[in-house]
Amino acid sequence: MTRVNSIIGFRPIPVTLLTVITYVSLFSALLFIDRQPPAVAKKGELDYWGVDIEEAWSDLEVLTRDFHPYNSRPNDDVRAYLLGRVQEILSRNGVSGFGNELQSSGYSGTVDLFDDGIPGKPGSNVTFVGAGSEDLTVYFEGTNIIVYIHGERPADELSPVLVSAHYDSVSTGYGATDDGAAVVSILQIIKSFTRPESQGGKRPKRGLVALLNNGEEDFLNGARAFAMHPVAKLPHSFLNLEGAGAGGRATLFRSTDAEVTKYYKRAKRPFGTIVSGDGFKAGLIRSGTDYSVFVENLGMRGLDVAFYQPRSRYHTTEDDARHSSKRSLWHMLGGSLATLRGMTDDTSKVFDSPNGSAGKGHNAVWFDLFGRAFSVLHLHTIFAFTITLIVVPFVVVLVAMWALGHFDKLYFFSNTAYIPPPPEHSIASRTTQGWRGVLRFPVAFVAASAGVVGMAFLINKINPMVVYASQYTVWTCFLSTWWIIAWVILRGADAVRPTALARGYGFLEQWLLWLVAMIGVAISIGKSHLGSGYWVLVFYSGFFTSAFISLLEMAALQKKSEVKIAVSGDDQAYPPEEHSQTGASGNISNRAANDDDDAGEHATEETPLFRGPNRPLSFAPHRNPRYDNGDHDSGDILVEEKDEAVYGGEQGWSKDLPSWTWILQFLATVPLQLVLAGSVALLLGNALAQTGADGSDMLTVLLGFGVFSIILLLPVAPFLHRITYHVTLFIFVIFVGTFIYNLAAPPFSPNARLKVYFQQTVDLQTGENNVHLVGHPDYIDRIVSKHIPSAKGKVDICQADKLKSGLRRCSWKGIAPRVVPQAPGGMPPEYGFSDWISYNVTKTGDGKATIKLRGRNTRACKLLFNKPLAKSPTLGNPIPGFPNTRELRLWSRDWERGWSVELTWEKEEDQEENKDSHSSAIVVCLWSDGNKVSDEIPALHEIRRYLPVWAIASKLADGLVEGSVPFMI
């Protein structure tokens, strides 16, 4: 039995080994999955899908040669390249099609290509109200590329599926991940779905609409323009491919419902959790994707799959092919192929309701396991499980405790005196000591958690941005803090006052803790329809199971009233007749009352610091009067004789407890919990660690790290007192290193550079130009004053930025831009500012005017009004019913064509005040091409050249340069 206990019993070596192996192996696996995308499929699998990863990578390299925002010449080059590639793919596969009019749902061909914006043909123009701003109106002319691959069944019978990506980049990023990888993936998807049968092709049951839209980065404009195209009325489901990071794995960002999410299960390497979707739903993630347009404007149901890390490279020059990989590309492409094949081969009517709409699905909860398995559940099912698990286990525990109490076997919360008691001169325990250990986990939990929270406040005070480049050292510091404090308390208490109930109390009390969390989960589901607490159910169920096992263990024990205590000293167990029942009763009650806390007499200088069974109460050589009846020497003191199955100084009755059940409890509470919580922790860590550059409160981020550090170690708490000191000593060394590092290390590095945001504004009337650099308030002043030559001693003001909350803006008179070509002669650019914008205002009536405006070398301008418009501006496809416009943004598919806009204000006599005031406005045009900054935007070139190596520039707004002219109406 001793040998068996040493192998599988609840002993230090088995517990330590299993704990260390489990945590190290699972953490290593989770980190590997998080950092390393899966390998590219072998040739056989690529041939099965009919795709070529080398060809896709070659396309990506072409697309990312230049910055290509909508308002740039390279954007036209990218569009021409993509159009040519689509035609090449269709021609190679023996199909062709080209049209701009959708006649019916029954086509004679198999593929139609729509060049939306071809010269001489009407394109998709759209006017809409800016999201979240009622006084903003946007007019946009689309230049999308649409490929409609027809299915076996017509669109009016089975709606086609939409797959979408945007081919524009931001003005400061090459767009390899945002959204080049998605664009080249769609090229390969078109290739796969149009293969002839001789090459392994298979015509889908439903059609597939492949959309390459232009203008997503500026306000989701491309998707809104697509909504005006006739093809947009056909699909009811979609897969949107995005990029909000720079490489890594593509995660399922969000989903409309469970029915459409199930298709993502077909992906060979699924990745994602509902936590990201709930982040959008709760408004915690403010950035948007085309997903919003497809759902809110077109009523579709679908998926949003996106790259999401590292955020420090997002919208910067490091979003290039060099910082991405073929592994990342294949992860998106492979998952998309499997998902779309499932969606297009589905012949059910789940997305085709009788009224012609996409119907409505059920809220979903989803998560992956090790990037290989994927679970999709209905939210209402999770809610039902939650309510059931709150009620049923609570009743089960109460019944089990009642039954154990009824049979006199409930050792928890007991201090039952042994009858007959040990002799007067024995130091053996006189009660079951069932209360011992009841407060250990609560005290350890509170103290260790307080230590982690305190550490978060300390780091936030001294070096809050260290998590930006070193999130793993922050994780390690928080984890080691909690472990050390909890271990010292739990192991120390076990050494001083050992008890066989410590593990059981730990499970029972954690189960109650997770019960409170379950109530919170139920409320979040019921009120807000948020399913991010799915992992709490696993924690709760595991700890209920383990707590119930601890209760079942007591069924193997003797009745408390039948426990006999043997003592040794003269190798004789005391006979019952030595103590009459009457004689014992007077002492039993007193001794029992004091047995658990050993506080029978007042402390003296000889009272020991620690007391416990089998320990003398003093280091002094004389007899203790408490156990001395005058007839015995100190050497005659009797101690409790315990079975070899009893560990250390634990209660003698624990010899009958099963020694192996801790393994079941460990398996119920540790592995799956670590996998689920660890996946969520890494997702949140990657998503939040670098948001400080966007103005996020770093204390909130650090506390989030702290909370999940606590959660990750809670499963091991009931076992901590059995883990040897060697582990904690090693962790302490790690803690010291990470603690010093987190307080002293530079927060940024060449691999995780702090983003600062650039824009230059020019008053074309006065010739005054200002450079604006926005960044983190702790660093932006230093960057501008110490590193930018043109700003040294010339910074006019640094103050809180109005556009980016939490950040600080520094402005100074910079080097004049040359974004508009000038006549030769070497004149300073300031002399040509007046030619950048031309406009003409004609008053057509009281409160009415027509303005014609045009910007040189641009196709993006805007009008800012001092008074809100009374009616919608008339231009393109106006949407009636949204007056009060104070800002009108204008986008044209043609260069320097300009716009003619009819405007209507309230009549002067209808205004209650400022009757004598005139309406005024400002014409602003944008220049967004950052490819020749040394010549055209030297201020940005200077910033890129002189920024410290740990900082990198990104765009502040749609235009890198804004030129403005005010006028009166």
Curated annotation (Swiss-Prot):
Biological process terms from the Gene Ontology for this record are: proteolysis
Citing just one GO molecular function, the answer is: metal ion binding
Which portions of the chain have biased composition (kind: Polar residues)? 581-592
**Site (Transition state stabilizer): residue numbering on this chain:** Y314
Which amino acids does the record list as binding Zn(2+) 2?
D178, E217, H315
User: Which locations, inside or outside the cell, does it occupy?
Assistant: Vacuole membrane
Q: Which residues lie on this side of the membrane: Cytoplasmic?
A: 1-12, 403-438, 491-505, 553-662, 720-727
- Provide one Gene Ontology cellular component: vacuolar membrane
Transmembrane segments annotated in the record for this chain: 13-33, 382-402, 439-459, 470-490, 506-526, 532-552, 663-683, 699-719, 728-748
Which is an annotated Pfam family here? PFF1_TM
Q: What is this protein called?
A: Vacuolar membrane protease
Q: Give the organism, scientific name.
A: Tuber melanosporum (strain Mel28)
Show the taxonomic lineage: Eukaryota, Fungi, Dikarya, Ascomycota, Pezizomycotina
